[in-house]
Amino acid sequence: MAGSWDTSVLPRVHPTVVHMLADAAARSGGATALVCGDRQLSYAQYLRCVAGFARELAGLGARGARVALICGNSLDIPVATFAVHAAAAQAVPINPTYTARELTHILVDAEAHVVIYDEDVAATVEPLCASLKVPHAIRIGGKTGRSLDAWKQDAALALPEPLPAASDFATLQYTGGTTGLPKGVNITHAQMSVNISQREAALPTRADDERILCMMPLFHVFAVAMCLHLAAYCRGRLVIMPRYKPDVLLDLLVRERITRLPAGPTVFIGLLSHEAFAATDFSSLRTAYSGSAPLPEETLRKWQAATGTPILEGFGQTEAGPVLTYVREGALKAGSVGPVLPLTELQIVDVETGTKVLGAGEIGEIRARGPQIMSGYRNRPKETAEALRDGWLYTGDIGEFDEQGYFTIRDRKKDMAIVGGYNVYPREVDEVLYSHADVKEAAASGVPDSYYGESIRAYVVLKEGARASAEDLIAHCRSNLARYKVPSKIYLVAELPRTTVGKVDRKTLRQKLAAEG
């Protein structure tokens, strides 16, 4: 699909991410590429290690096959990921917290030829690979696994030939699976590479002068896009946190003079209430990026007031390669995910048929097209046909755009509630709750109601020391929402149900709220 678009209007588009890394090593070989704890690699060393491991994978027959990566954050995971690409194999990044049941579905569906894993998951992965008869399993990192920086001094190493083609599959990224079994999204090198350049056009970086902090897990599509690929494209330094700890993040931000901070909304919310936040020096930070879940407007305002740095919010999904829109620097609009990226088209269409195109200010489903859109789902022809219709990706997200072309996401189509015949988008209720001074986190959902069909309920986490009652919060909603949108019940809880990547788990949320009685 990328080939039918005029990509000459974009900053340099590499044929594949392997070419991108090779270019970075050629231009900035002595610059530090990766830092994780006391380990680091220059760009020249990075490429050597990728070449060394890629040659090993190629020798195992990985070309054209799927290679699963079940690893936590470390210096080894970027090397392994690029090595899979360099071996002309398709990378399958998998959440390392998945159970054996969840892993089985993905490994079987992907027909994994090689599984790369670390010692933290060895007890689960090794017997599973044996039972599934996976041809090859390689343990990396830690005290008992292979160290993938072993090739860093071997200047004679070269990438295996031939390199992958732009039309080859680069990744098979499985979607979260909060409803049903995860679906594998096929993304080609062309689709991946053009989206990197689309993001660069919208969010320009400074070549050889960026330091990006990666606290997100590198199996997640947002982390791969906004950390791993962003750093390699601009030849910046990627500082990797093995796991997220707010005090460590704040320390690294100052010590490493971080310039770019991609994170999910829960991180920004948590940092604002951390005891060390007010004393942290944010002078090096140029931009923070938010994605993967809605960012409360109140969080955006508080962050910018406290740090002097904007949080730029974008919109996308795994199927979209993954980014479709982003707020531009200097053009912040609270609550908006910005205008489209170059070479990207978004339309709002009616929810019922998806065929009637709506205008500015009208709410409907977002559909998208562009050179970054997925090829389809693996082994899911029916779901592919439902998602890709008439050249458009139907995102399942509800939103609108204004006269300036700025998009606002209202909710997921499947999360919309119908209360007495009226459409209610839980995210709007969330935003009103977040505007209360005592609220730290909030999540609303529709639940079955014998009279109205559905009614709204919500969980709320209060700030430390806050004293608001559920009745106070309902009164606040009554002052700011139409009557049918006001939660019938609000429950004060210690934490919201979340998925393993930190998003509010909407499926569990609905189930728990419905069970409250």
Describe each region flagged by the PLM.
Residues 14, 30, 156-176, 181, ...:
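Conserved pre-ATP/AMP-binding loop-to-beta segment of ANL
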Residues 120-166, 176, 181, 274:
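ANL superfamily adenylate-forming
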Residues 255-263, 272-333, 345:
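Gly/Ser/Thr-rich phosphate-binding loop
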Residues 77, 98, 115-117, 370, ...:
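AMP-binding/adenylate-forming catalytic core of the ANL superfamily
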Residues 9-13, 22, 30-61, 65-74, ...:
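Conserved AMP-binding/adenylate-forming core of the ANL superfamily
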Residues 339-343, 354-386, 422-424:
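Conserved ATP/PPi-binding loop(s) of AMP-dependent carboxylate-activating enzymes
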Residues 42-44, 170-197:
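Conserved AMP-binding A3 loop
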Residues 193-211, 221-260, 274:
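Conserved AMP-binding/adenylation subdomain of ANL enzymes
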